[in-house]
A protein has these predicted regions:
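Non-catalytic substrate-recognition and accessory regions of acyl/acetyltransferase enzymes
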Residues: 1-117, 123, 127, 131-146, ...
């Protein structure tokens, strides 16, 4: 279920609420309690130190996924538009318009408190990220959703399990 309220896209499916980082002072302060996993310190650093500035400069949109009951920050993701270069031949390239899933991380503090919730990342991807990206693609004409995964085979396999393919 989606509703556009002023310039903020609000999504609420009863379990989680998705809001822009800049939608409220409460949202801006909720990131202080975010903790990423062992290999994702850069995602935590981005959320706490750079995401709001990127939001204000219209470089990307950062969405906070909060528990509907407790309002605890469960995870976040950032989206932006991009062009993906495609080699047609060795010397001829073209580009394809896309939406980039620039950042995506689960709050380990939330995961520890909510052990009964399994595969929250996949759930958020399917329930929130894909519908928002499809809406964006219809508005701006993007053909792909892309993610630039670090050279971590486990992470790449995870994205492949969600339907991504290596280029």
């Amino acid at each position: 279920v989606c509703m556009i309220l002023s310039d903020q896209l609000i999504v609420d499916n009863g379990d989680f609420v998705v809001e822009h980082l800049d939608a409220s002072t409460e949202n801006r302060h909720s990131v202080d309690s975010f903790a990423s996993g062992n290999n994702a310190q850069g995602l935590e650093l981005y959320l706490k130190n750079f995401a709001l500035n990127d939001e204000l400069l219209n470089e990307s949109r950062t969405y906070l996924v909060k528990d509907s009951l407790s309002k605890a920050l469960a995870c976040y993701f950032s989206l932006r538009t991009c062009l993906v270069p495609i080699a047609l031949t060795k010397s001829l390239f073209t580009t394809v318009s896309a939406v980039e899933l620039a950042n995506f991380a689960v709050n380990e503090n939330y995961r520890k408190k909510q052990r009964a919730i399994k595969k929250i990342g996949a759930y958020v991807f399917l329930e929130f990220i894909l519908p928002i990206v499809k809406h964006i693609a219809n508005l701006v004409g993007a053909r792909w959703l892309c993610v630039y995964a670090l050279p971590d085979e486990k992470l790449i396999r995870y994205y492949e399990s969600l339907g991504f393919a290596r280029l």
